[in-house]
């Protein structure tokens, strides 16, 4: 939920209340050397933990990217960290001022654009490692779990620190 914090969504989400579709067997496709039911997936960001992975796998997504993790815990940026935006005027190449917060949100998904900056929060490694194992156990045959990993430099550590962490 956009009106709740990352921590709240991590603990309580997802809040999906619909029914799950019946998933039929399909001929498998190749995806970077792995066989998957489809190439329909979820990018890094919204699958905060194994509950989120399980929900989206049951909704029919077959390539599921576990929320970005780090070698240490990192908090999320405070709200608002996800806003709907619209162009200020016609998009001009090279212009710095091109977007503003949307005055109203369109009901047509093709007209909706959002800007997100969560700050790539992460649970501590001992938490996410155990949860990634749990997430893998919730996948069906033909589904693939990708874990998004990012390096975190030590305070004032520079490039060498980032490389060492990664």
Describe each PLM feature range:
Residues 18-41, 129-137, 141-142:
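N-terminal amphipathic alpha-helix/helix-capping segment at the start of soluble metabolic enzymes
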Residues 15-16, 45, 50-166:
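Active-site entrance/lid segments in N-terminal catalytic domains of soluble metabolic enzymes
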Residues 1-31, 112, 116-126:
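An N-cap/entry alpha-helix motif that binds or orients negatively charged groups
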């Amino acid at each position: 939920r956009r009106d709740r914090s990352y921590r709240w969504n991590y603990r309580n989400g997802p809040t999906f209340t619909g029914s799950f579709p019946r998933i039929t067997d399909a001929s498998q496709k190749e995806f970077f050397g792995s066989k998957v039911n489809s190439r329909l997936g979820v990018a890094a960001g919204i699958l905060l933990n194994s509950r989120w992975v399980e929900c989206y796998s049951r909704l029919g997504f077959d390539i599921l990217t576990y929320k970005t993790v780090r070698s240490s815990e990192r908090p999320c940026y405070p709200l608002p960290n996800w806003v709907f935006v619209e162009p200020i005027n016609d998009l001009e190449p090279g212009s710095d001022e091109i977007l503003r917060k949307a005055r109203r949100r369109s009901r047509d998904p093709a007209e909706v654009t959002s800007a997100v900056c969560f700050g790539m929060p992460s649970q501590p490694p001992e938490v996410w490692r155990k949860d990634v194992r749990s997430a893998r156990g919730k996948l069906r045959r033909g589904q693939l779990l990708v874990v998004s990993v990012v390096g975190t430099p030590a305070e004032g550590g520079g490039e060498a620190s980032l490389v060492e962490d990664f």
